[in-house]
């Protein structure tokens, strides 16, 4: 399985944790993490939320492939077991984590699924680390590994 995570961020403040879960996931799947941040996004974020969201969408469009999942606070809440079932039979997964302003509704609706990790607003850098842990947990559930108790 190929797992892709696309995130609007310049750097990874949670790099140590991200690397830990990336290594664990590599036992089950090929993982590609791409931090998308360019000059257009930086300028748009200084203008307003609408322009920022448009710039995120433009940056993400070339990466829409496989089963696409938006991380969205208005998305569906799943248990870890439900999440494991959701990703179980997919050949390729692409997760999209918006920047400070989130993602446009139209972009979210164009994807296959909208996932909420929490009703709380979370820093997008933290969301990526939390998502990596849940992906690893899902692989453990699907492979009867004792990590998920």
UniProtKB/Swiss-Prot annotation:
The keyword Ribosomal protein does not apply. CDD domains: RlmH-like. It is found in: Cytoplasm. GO terms for molecular function: rRNA (pseudouridine-N3-)-methyltransferase activity. GO terms for cellular component: cytoplasm. Specifically methylates the pseudouridine at position 1915 (m3Psi1915) in 23S rRNA. This is Ribosomal RNA large subunit methyltransferase H. The lineage of its organism: Bacteria, Pseudomonadati, Campylobacterota, Epsilonproteobacteria, Campylobacterales.
């Amino acid at each position: 399985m190929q797992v892709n995570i696309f995130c609007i961020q310049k750097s990874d403040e949670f790099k140590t944790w991200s690397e830990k879960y990336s290594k664990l996931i590599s036992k089950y799947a090929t993982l590609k993490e791409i931090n998308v941040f360019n000059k257009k996004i930086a300028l748009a974020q200084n203008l307003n939320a609408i322009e920022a969201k448009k710039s995120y969408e433009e940056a993400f469009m070339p990466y829409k492939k496989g089963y696409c999942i938006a991380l969205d606070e208005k998305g569906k809440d799943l248990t870890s077991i439900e999440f494991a079932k959701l990703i179980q039979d997919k050949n390729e997964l692409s997760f999209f984590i918006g920047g400070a302003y989130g993602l446009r509704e139209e972009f979210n609706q164009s994807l296959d699924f909208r996932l909420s990790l929490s009703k709380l607003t979370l820093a997008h850098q933290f969301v990526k680390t939390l998502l990596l842990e849940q992906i690893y947990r899902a692989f453990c559930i699907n492979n009867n590994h004792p990590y998920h108790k």
